[in-house]
Amino acid sequence: MALCLKQVFSKDKTFRPRKRFEPGTQRFELYKKAQASLKSGLDLRSVVRLPPGENIDDWIAVHVVDFFNRINLIYGTMAERCSETSCPVMAGGPRYEYRWQDERQYRRPAKLSAPRYMALLMDWIESLINDEDVFPTRVGVPFPKNFQQVCTKILTRLFRVFVHVYIHHFDSILSMGAEAHVNTCYKHFYYFIREFSLVDQRELEPLREMTERICH
């Protein structure tokens, strides 16, 4: 089972990324730069900092897409253990419950099972990052004025995936030998959102004790 999570971070993934960067684009070059820094062994706090001369929205866009792919893959490796029966409510322990709301099917906050919430979340994020009006890929096309607000909402909801996985499926992480991989992804994500103040501090509370232990 340990091989399963290693495949998540390798070139031969069991679960394919939903979004790729087009070779030859500025976004692709930034992605390569970010990945090279990750593999260089640099401190993750340093890795997330905006490189000199780069556009902050491009940098955020690259990381939002990368985190979406990675977190989607992490959840995918343990999705069979997160069922309507085992997780009838999308929650983070007894104190935190997450309800789903969107502009189509659920206009009011709805209590859903964790797998249903996850499916809606991943589809919602995928639709946003594939929307040229939100995540433009053409040269010279500016980001929308509310781009960072959109990214804040995406990253806040992705953080909730970490909350659910760590609190409700930590045994699965351990049984797959995946703790180090998931922790590294979480630390990378955490340092990034803190560097650019992209997620409200209150949203981070469910994993505060763990974060203090592994990120400080």
UniProtKB/Swiss-Prot annotation:
Belongs to the MOB1/phocein family. The keyword Transcription does not apply. InterPro entries: MOB_kinase_act_fam (IPR005301), MOB_kinase_act_sf (IPR036703). This is MOB kinase activator 3C. May regulate the activity of kinases. It comes from the Eukaryota. GO terms for biological process: signal transduction. The gene is MOB3C. GO terms for molecular function: metal ion binding; protein kinase activator activity. Pfam families: Mob1_phocein (PF03637). Keywords: Metal-binding, Zinc. SUPFAM superfamilies: Mob1/phocein. Signal peptide: none annotated. One of its GO terms (cellular component) is nucleus.
